[in-house]
Amino acid sequence: MNILKILILLELIYTCVSGLSFTVTSKIYMDVKHQKKPLGRIVFGLFGKRAPKTVTNFRHICLRGINGTTYVGSEFHRVISRFLIQGGDIVNNDGTGSTSIYGDFFQDEALDVEHLRPGYLGMANRGPDTNGCQFYVTTVAAQWLNGKHTVFGKVIEGMDTVYAIEDVKTDTDDHPIDPVIIVNCGEMPTEPYEFYPDDFSILGWIKAAGLPFCSSFIVLMIFHYFFRQLNMYC
């Protein structure tokens, strides 16, 4: 019985830790300016295992572009205080365009990742399975987006730059009065590693670990039952 308790404890620890982490497979940076002055750099850790198609598309646009057009020169065209900053329209630069390496649109991924803290990187869309080139970064917890948008990364450096973008003056349509422009983007070398965001609440901990732990617990209890039954007849 002691062995069973140890196995259950180890399984609980494993499922809890794995459920609350993301594997960062690559890091992309963007340098941003406003009113001809540098605002700073944002570094994104991308979740290539959770959202492989989305990460591949995002990296390709950053590094190679589509028909030669990358994110360089595009704007953060939508800025809403206490919500998000949005950019990446390499077609029209105003939020109306869409393109990707898969066509105009591609399917959703990683809809189970929740917007529990600022700094999550997600795909802007027009409804289910309408991802393209536009992306957003949350500046607050935004749970109302959960299940509706592909979340494929998180800011790991440069939230001060994100907040600086959030603070620029906008018009009544949430467009910055003076453009906020991506002047450079690229990739930072990294080996895949586990990233633990700072959004661990007790509820999130239970939600992440509960189902896999219960499943494992049931399997272990069934195994233990049959093991005892075998011992009774030996």
UniProtKB/Swiss-Prot annotation:
Principal location listed in the UniProt entry: membrane
GO molecular function, one term: peptidyl-prolyl cis-trans isomerase activity
Leader peptide range in chain numbering: 1-19
EC id: 5.2.1.8
Enzyme class: isomerase
Any one cellular-component term (Gene Ontology): intracellular membrane-bounded organelle
UniProt key word Metal-binding: no
Keyword Transcription regulation attached: no
Residues annotated as glycosylated: N67
Segments forming domain PPIase cyclophilin-type: 29-187
Tissue specificity remark: Expressed specifically in photoreceptor cells.
Family annotation (PROSITE patterns): CSA_PPIASE_1 (PS00170), CSA_PPIASE_2 (PS50072)
UniProt function note: PPIases accelerate the folding of proteins. It catalyzes the cis-trans isomerization of proline imidic peptide bonds in oligopeptides. Acts on the folding of rhodopsin RH1 and RH2 (but not RH3) and is required for visual transduction.
Name by which UniProt lists this protein: Peptidyl-prolyl cis-trans isomerase, rhodopsin-specific isozyme
Lineage, broadest ranks: Eukaryota, Metazoa, Ecdysozoa, Arthropoda, Hexapoda
